[in-house]
Amino acid sequence: MDNSSGQNSRTASSASTSKIVNYSSPVSPGVAAATSSSSSSSSSGMSSSQEDTVLGLFTPKKEFPNAKMLQTIREKLMTPGGACDLLALGIAAEPTDQQPVKLIQQRYLISAQPSHISAAVAAKTPASYRHLVDLTASNLRCVDIFTGEQFLCRIVNEPLHKVQRAYFQLQQHDEELRRSTIYGHPLIRPVHDIIPLTKDRTYILIAPVPQERDSTGGVTGVYENLHTYIRHAKRLCETEARAIFHQICQTVQVCHRNGIILRDLKLKRFYFIDEARTKLQYESLEGSMILDGEDDTLSDKIGCPLYTAPELLCPQQTYKGKPADMWSLGVILYTMLVGQYPFYEKANCNLITVIRHGNVQIPLTLSKSVRWLLLSLLRKDYTERMTASHIFLTPWLREQRPFHMYLPVDVEVAEDWSDAEEDEGTAADAMDDDEEGLCPLGDKHEYEDIGVEPLDYTRSTLQMAQNANGLSTEPEPDTDVDMG
């Protein structure tokens, strides 16, 4: 088939199907030549109907991936000379609603959904702070052409070797550290494959969580993210929030130890993987910065404005990455306990001003230990913030124990009930005798053993800390604000 006849056939095919819109992107001369040669060789022995099948690689978004579409691509890849980048594919529901489709590694088909940031929102964002809004975020869906498996696809703005090194350290080293000390599950979702996109960008294909029964009888899988969960629950009690926040802090700790700055740390990044909504996993390293050494000085400012640290909103070009992550941890903890963000303004300009002042109102209804932890995380001066290596020494998080430690599995039942009651009474008397020597959160010697002085949680101490931060001690009205 010569070029003129192939062109006429394509014109007739597009005219017969009104909802088929060819999508083509610029290609290099080498790829274009390979595409042209493969098309001519594969179409030489085909009938008109078979050629229409090959060219009609378009389907509505809700039907992606279409079985017929995948079968067509399989046949093309198995055709001699057909192993080339298919840069002329696309799926569309309407002629004006196009979605590019890309084939990578001759195996994975990636579909890019439209950005969730509208043009109106982008126009209202001040130019000087536009880096705080992810204007190019897209929901990438990936399917294995040969097995039909579907994966989440994310893009990391780091070269391939750095992403491979980071995931190798997270998944191969520190087996005990990368698992939750409460439930024992992996804190970061494993990846299925890591593929280079450009010299400085990398695809990561996230493996799905298998559906199976866990030890408690619940079904594992991927459930809603933490942001959605809190919107429905309004706010969490301290006991539930402690178990969840413990897993989040452990995730940040293991990343910081391996030279990974998460940067875009927020509630939507964490997903529940059990039916009881107790186990959390961090989705991926999308938006993260992988360090080459110990210096965590960064210049690229990204992240959600509601979680952004004050130093990112200052004129300085650089900032420290690890303290910025700790500020985001404070915002996450505050939102879980109060049911609203500590800094919330409908207009981004006002929000930036509020965050730069660093004034946060902490309700007095919270316990003293968690109020002190919030004050330690939401410090305007980043040099005074709590670090990931010290956060587990705080009394509020030290109250969290692994779930199996709450079950008295090793308790022996006494044969004589009278003897058991007598022993119980003796133990209660001993506790009463020692009560005067204990502080509310434990013995002083308990903290000295780990090199940490006991914290003074008197009202005057909290008053001084709040005055130093410009905080008011008046109780906050018990109202909910839409989390947006």
From Swiss-Prot:
Residues 420-437, 475-484 have a biased composition (Acidic residues). Pfam families: Pkinase. SMART domains: S_TKc (SM00220). Residues 1-51, 420-443, 464-484 are annotated as: Disordered. Expressed throughout the brain with highest levels of expression detected in the cell body rind and lower levels of expression detected in the neurophil (at protein level). SUPFAM superfamilies: Protein kinase-like (PK-like) (SSF56112). Residues 1-23 have a biased composition (Polar residues). It is found in: Nucleus; Cytoplasm; Cytoplasm, Cell cortex. Changing residue 266 to R: No effect on mitosis. Embryos display an early pause in the cell cycle similar to wild-type. GO terms for biological process: glucose homeostasis; negative regulation of developmental growth; negative regulation of insulin receptor signaling pathway; negative regulation of lipid storage; negative regulation of mitotic nuclear division; negative regulation of phosphatidylinositol 3-kinase/protein kinase B signal transduction; positive regulation of cell size; positive regulation of proteasomal ubiquitin-dependent protein catabolic process. Belongs to the protein kinase superfamily. CAMK Ser/Thr protein kinase family. Tribbles subfamily. The protein kinase domain is predicted to be catalytically inactive. Interacts with slbo. Interacts with Akt1. 'tribbles' is named after fictional small round organisms from the Star Trek universe that proliferate uncontrollably. This is Tribbles. It comes from Drosophila melanogaster. The gene is trbl.
